[in-house]
Amino acid sequence: MPFTRWKGVRNNTDYKLLIRMKIYQLYRRQYLNLSLQEAWEFFSSPYNLNDITPEFFHVSIISKVPEKIYAGLMLNYQMKAVFGIPMTWLSEISHCDEPKRFVYEQRIGPFKFWSHEVCLTETQNGIVLEDIMFYAMPIGWLGQLINTVLIASKLERIFDTRRDYLDSKWGLKP
């Protein structure tokens, strides 16, 4: 996936900054027993975020949002991500290709860079859900250390919780 397709990369200077950053990737794939339309209805609703996020995160949407996402939608969240410290996260739905994929990108938040693509692919038995995340930590080598010690495992835990929740509702073995 080329970086230049991300909305946050506006010119060659931005692209060069991305190249110098330590970019981390997290990829998840899950098979679910529901139709493409049912999957889109669930994942495109900002109100389902609480169901698929661990309770320790205390996520709440603090901006007024519609029932379904669309390209350009700004979502403002409050969460307690690290040591129970409240933080605000503003993200934008930068791409929306109903009912197959959407991308949200951090505009204000704890990361130097964050892009999360959610892809839904119809199969004979349901759908394949794919999450493709790229992120970079702020504050140079210290951010890289914090990622190694704390953040990477927290992100894994978030997506493990989501996987377990979705499996309990619509789990399907490949």
Language model segments and positions:
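Hydrophobic ligand-binding cavity/cleft-lining segments
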Residues: 15-70
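Beta-strand elements of well-folded, non-transmembrane domains
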Residues: 32-34, 79-83, 95, 110, ...
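Beta-strand/loop substructures that line and gate deep hydrophobic ligand-binding cavities in soluble
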Residues: 106-157
